[in-house]
Amino acid sequence: MALDSVWAPQAAIIGDAPAKKVGNQASLQAQVLQTASLKDGPAKRAVRVCCKSSMPEEPTKSTVTKERPKPEVTKAVVVDLGTGYCKCGFAGLPKPTHRISTTVGKPYMETTKTGDNRKETFVGQELVNTEVRLKLVNPLRHGIIVDWDTVQDIWEYLFRQEMNIAPEEHAVLVSDPPLSPHTNREKYAEMLFETFNTPAMHIAYQSRLSMYSYGRTSGLVVEVGHGVSYVVPIYEGYPLPSITGRLDYAGSDLTAYLMTLMNNSGKYFTEDQMSIVENIKKKCCFVALDPIEEKKVPPTEHTILYTLPDGKEIHLCQERFLCSEIFFKPSLIRSMQLGLHTQTLSCLNKCDIALKRDLMGNILLCGGSTMLSGFPNRLQKELSSMCPNDTPLVNVLPERDSAVWTGGSILASLQGFQPLWVHRFEYEEHGPFFLYRRCF
């Protein structure tokens, strides 16, 4: 079978030893070849993924064999819809070319009238360019879609304006979060096939795609996004939902807690200024390796100046690292769930001995919130202190905030993956349940 090579960044290992590579897989196997490339500067890992359907095709009852159309895989589109951002671009590229906020604007009721044909949803740059008074709406809650009409508006904007493409000419690969309702996949198929008339589509779990971006076929994916966090054990390409951990705190909760800390110290922000607080988080905050020792440091060593959009300057001090403690002590935001490190160890302890040993050396960090300075080292420290007799190894990629999209880009561009596309004529003939034959 012909294999294509796709470049993925070399992962850094936070622990003391190289992560162990896990063996072959029946339905989806990956060979990780250590190579170097001058392209983009750093060393790259060539990942060759050989795919084949694990389910044999059922013989057609018709006497006439309908030939399956083959989409242009080089022009397949990969879409990763998250609570914070929607990333998209063509398969085969190292990172997404388009990234817009998932939060959209809707006109207030008093500005719209019955029969009014004015625009109902403002997406991306439209939010900046309009003078219409808008309320901000997010169609996702903790990673799960609750407003499909708004998602359709976002994708319409992405396809037609951001990417400037006709979706009916491109196959689309969509990411789906762990533990999501099965109806999600059927809704995606309905929207892509019936609204956008795409010729083919495929849905893949986000955690699996994140793992592919690391060039692995097994691993413990620890993903901390904007609206939800997951700890997902994956063995030979298959997520293990029975021992997957879900945490309902993530980056948006960190932002809200940062606002609380700043308000308590006399720097007052409102909900309408959350985007400013989000920017402060990204530019000024970090994760302390030891928060107790960090508090002993003279405040002047932590204090920095931040200039607000109106030109006013504020001083930021201990809130720069205190806000991130919610990931390791969620009781700070009145959450009864486990800390991220404790949930990670809990998932590992639910695995059998052999699998635990393999996953312990393949802890893969993903998601935008893990980009905070010091995050990987703190998680490594917490895990090492909780299991001193084992050797947990936290692996990180420099662009792990786009790990899901990059994994989808790798997968959708491979020749061996092409039999796993679900085509529109198959959906029309067999219905939405045909998805589960190819998207598993």
Predicted regions: what they are:
Residues 2-14, 18-21, 29-33, 41-440:
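C-terminal region/appendage detector
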